[in-house]
């Protein structure tokens, strides 16, 4: 599909991985990534540790590394497709299947691309990050995030995805002065024939995002 590109420029940011998480260098200093902040929530760290203890650390590392590699692969293919319409070649069947199911929902609903892999930050929140996609989705501007999963997701278990996108929306508005109130999370899933699509309103999560970020910086 040929997309309309009405690109909004963003200043590139240098990112560094540290022992405490990912940091972005902004004109006003180093800010942690929103994914780092969300991952540092006490309940998230406890849950992750319980999972690692239950299945064993070596197996947990293998699962995490495999998931990370596949996620990176899918993200790179989607970015290339969105910006150049090029399709991936010579990929593993499982990767192609996941890319194809995500491509289908994107082709159906995405009208205009404003930015892909956009580096953003907020001086107000003291947070930064890189947003997968910003564009016009079903007639309205939205923050669009790509996820991959081996299992089908339930909405009640993906609140952090909405929080992450809400933070991107707040960064976007601070940087551009343009409204962006909608969230779309697209999950490529091994268990489903089509990608899962979850839509939400940014304003439902703003207070929680502010609280979590303030707690992190306290």
Where are these regions (language model features)?
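Mg2+/Mn2+-dependent nuclease catalytic core
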Residues: 114-218
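Metal-dependent nuclease catalytic cores that hydrolyze phosphodiester bonds in DNA/RNA
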Residues: 1-128
């Amino acid at each position: 599909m040929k997309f309309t590109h009405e690109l909004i420029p963003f200043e590139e940011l240098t990112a560094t991985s540290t022992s405490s998480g990912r940091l972005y260098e902004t004109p006003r200093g180093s800010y942690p990534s929103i994914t780092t902040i969300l991952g540092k929530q006490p309940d998230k760290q406890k849950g992750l540790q319980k999972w690692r203890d239950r299945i064993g650390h070596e197996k947990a590392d293998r699962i995490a590394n495999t998931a990370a590699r596949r996620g990176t692969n899918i993200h790179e293919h989607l970015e290339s497709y969105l910006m150049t319409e090029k399709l991936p070649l010579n990929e593993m069947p499982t990767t192609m299947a996941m890319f194809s199911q995500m491509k289908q929902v994107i082709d159906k609903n995405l009208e205009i691309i404003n930015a892909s892999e956009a580096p953003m930050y907020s001086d107000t929140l003291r947070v930064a990050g890189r947003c997968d996609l910003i564009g016009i989705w079903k007639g309205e501007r939205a923050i669009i995030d790509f996820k991959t999963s081996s299992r089908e997701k339930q909405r009640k278990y993906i609140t952090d995805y909405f929080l992450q996108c809400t933070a991107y929306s707040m960064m976007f508005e601070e940087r551009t002065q343009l409204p962006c109130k909608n969230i779309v999370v697209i999950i490529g899933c091994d268990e489903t024939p089509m990608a899962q699509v979850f839509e939400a309103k940014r304003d439902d999560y703003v207070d929680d995002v502010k609280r979590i970020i303030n707690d992190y910086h306290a």
